[in-house]
């Protein structure tokens, strides 16, 4: 039996940009040659791509870290480093990608061959050619490559199906799917034979078709995680029409009406919008003795429980075993699909902003100041830390440039206003220097 995995937590780390070079021309007949250090190449991004051949997230169970390659360093004679190739990670169709820390949805991958940059590679550092000015025609300044984005992502897989079969275990969902579609699910005379969603293509009439999914049996408390409830309910979210399968036989000793109410309560508790989907009641196993009598009792209870303005739900009498009553059910299902639009899982406007953005967000202030336990001062913040990482401290001019940029950010003024004294230690990441007032 193949395992099914519909959630995974992974780390994606894009490649660092290549360092820029400090170099000078050393050519015959060219005295006092100018700067010749090239730029570093860009780091490789991590890109998710939909693969229709994948049906689970099992590949991410043991392979949880994906790293892009770094760009090459800049070279002499103004030659730029080669950019790294992007890392393509294949995911199944229907995968939702979320930021693990915030829970924000980054993208919903539902289109064939759809791609999305989940971690952008760092840009290459500039070589000293870029820093030449009339006042300083031969600078010994170059940048280190920009670090690539590093994220923890949560992947959730929801099967892509138009119609979902819901109901308690052993009510005949798998049998029904097997006789109306090309699916061949495992069928057994015991509960939870189906532990993964089965999908089949259903042909109706001339040319009409739709995808039907047999959802594993639900139990009371599924919305709060009882059994494997949340995993199963997640897959129903993409469907447009629900077929609620009820067992009208006496084999399991169940009450069809209580089953009907319990399953709908679970759907509503998990996600209110699931109850907005058209739902057909499928009275299954009508070939069994006493089935007609039990169906009549079900209809009486259902009618008595309806509000004054509620219409009686549509009920179809079928037998998956003898294949009776199925054509009418499928025809009505096809009609409802034609009338029912897709239900959006996420707000398109909010999702659009996330999809369009690949870079680093600007903070209101480029740095923050805090105190260490020993009384030293610590600078932090994405902007100033990135500036620090991209500074090449092997060259004095680069160090002086970094100091000027710190002053331009207002670091000196802020430290002074917070009480920093001459000789106090100031730290940024693992680097330490003395404050000079």
From Swiss-Prot:
Keywords carried by this UniProt record: Cytoplasm, GTP-binding, Hydrolase, Magnesium, Metal-binding, Nucleotide-binding
Binding positions for Mg(2+) per the UniProt entry: 174, 194
Primary location class: cytoplasm
InterPro entries reported in the protein's UniProt record: G_OBG, GTP-bd, GTP-bd_Obg/CgtA, GTP-bd_prot_GTP1/OBG_C_sf, GTP1-OBG_CS, GTP1_OBG_dom, GTP1_OBG_dom_sf, OBG_GTPase
Disulfide bonds: none
Cofactor dependence: Mg(2+)
EC number: 3.6.5.-
GO cellular component, one term: cytoplasm
Gene3D superfamilies listed in its UniProt record: GTP-binding protein OBG, C-terminal domain (3.30.300.350), GTP1/OBG domain (2.70.210.12), P-loop containing nucleotide triphosphate hydrolases (3.40.50.300)
Residue runs in coiled coils: none
GO biological process: ribosome biogenesis
Top-rank taxon, per record: Bacteria
Subcellular location: Cytoplasm
NCBIfam families: Obg_CgtA (TIGR02729), Obg_CgtA_exten (TIGR03595), PRK12296.1 (NF008954), PRK12297.1 (NF008955), PRK12299.1 (NF008956)
Protein role: An essential GTPase which binds GTP, GDP and possibly (p)ppGpp with moderate affinity, with high nucleotide exchange rates and a fairly low GTP hydrolysis rate. Plays a role in control of the cell cycle, stress response, ribosome biogenesis and in those bacteria that undergo differentiation, in morphogenesis control.
Name of the molecule in the record: GTPase Obg
Species of provenance: Lactococcus lactis subsp. cremoris (strain MG1363)
Gene (UniProt): obg
